Amino acid sequence: MTTSSYFLLVALGLLLYVCQSSFGSPHTSDSGTTLVRRRLCGSELVTYLGELCLGNRKRRGFPSMLKARAKRNEAFLLQRDGRGIVEDCCYNDCTDEKLKEYCHTLQG
C-alpha cells in the first residue's frame, strides 16, 4: 500500500467518523421517546414546517403560502427566545418539538 493510498484511507475513515458523530444516533427524552435531531434549511425547512404544523391534515395552499413568506424572509424572522428558526434549525440541529414552537406564529 502506497503512502498516498494509506493517507486517503485514513482521511476517509476520519470523514466517516465526523459524519457519524455529527448525524449520530437519535437522542432519547426523559419520557423514553426518541428525539430525532435534524438540520433543515431553505425550502426544505419551510415544507417540513408546513407538514409538521398541519399534522396529518392536508390543507391546500398552506405549503405554498409558507414558501411565499420565505421568499419575503418573514418565515425566517420568526423569533423564539431571541433566536430565529434558521438559527435554531438550520445552523444547529433541532427536534420536531422545537419546530412545533413556531407553528402558532405561522398559523396565527
Curated annotation (Swiss-Prot):
One of its GO terms (biological process) is glucose metabolic process. Its main location: secreted. The modification 4-carboxyglutamate is found at E44, E87. Residues 1-24 form the signal peptide. It is found in: Secreted. It comes from the Eukaryota. One of its GO terms (molecular function) is hormone activity. This venom insulin, from a fish-hunting cone snail, facilitates prey capture by rapidly inducing hypoglycemic shock. It is one of the smallest known insulin found in nature and lacks the C-terminal segment of the B chain that, in human insulin, mediates engagement of the insulin receptor (INSR) and assembly of the hormone's hexameric storage form. Despite lacking this segment, it both binds and activates human insulin receptor (long isoform (HIR-B)) with a moderate potency (EC(50)=30.45 nM). Belongs to the insulin family. Heterodimer of A and B chains; disulfide-linked. This is Con-Ins K1.
